[in-house]
Amino acid sequence: MGLSDKLLAVVDVACGFLNIDSWRFDTIMAAHGRPIATAVGVKKVRPENPVMAYIGDGAAYSIGMAETMHTAISNDNVVAIVINNSLYGMTGGQCAPTSLPGQKTTSTPRGKDPKKCGMPFNIVDAFSGMDIAYLSRGALSDPANINKSKKMVRKAFEKHMAGEGFCLVELLSPCPTNL
């Protein structure tokens, strides 16, 4: 797409920042849970640049849920790539709003009990009725799903570059080490 010379990425202080040394574009580190809101601010001062927030599910749907929701309501023209590993990975693998029923985590060693911890949050279900430019959920589980996910990310950036508004792509991803 030829965006790397212009792209500005905002990352969270959690797991998402661990790969920025391999990126070939400029990055900004935001406070925990605030990359999407920070990306909105960056886009307002640099409207000519493509702007992406790269954030985990815990930060986007827990500590940063207000920012995620407000950006969707406002339909601000930024891309959010949310890596959903179904737990709080950076702090040791605890149960998160996205943890699945029965999923074992460090804080739910017998598995998540929905009666005690609630059902997993699903962003596509929650935001499907909102007037945003693009919303999708992909998986990084095998080559076929990775290729589908790449197409989702491409479509989000195409809509973003056309100025259509908020684009959120959630990518289901394992966290085998619970960093």
Spell out what each predicted region is.
Residues 2-3, 45-46, 159-160:
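Glycine-rich phosphate/diphosphate-binding loops that line cofactor/substrate pockets in enzymes
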Residues 2-19:
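N-terminal glycine-rich anion-binding loops that anchor highly charged ligand groups
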Residues 4, 48-49, 134:
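Secondary-structure boundary/capping positions in well-ordered alpha/beta enzyme cores
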Residues 6-8, 50, 166:
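Beta-sheet entry/capping signal
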Residues 10, 54-55, 168:
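Generic enzyme active-site microenvironment
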Residues 12-17, 41-45, 98-101, 127-131:
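Short amphipathic alpha-helical segments, especially helix-boundary/capping motifs
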Residues 15-89, 151-155:
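Thiamine diphosphate
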Residues 63-74, 78, 83, 87-179:
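Glycine-rich ThDP/TPP pyrophosphate-binding loop and its adjacent helix/strand module
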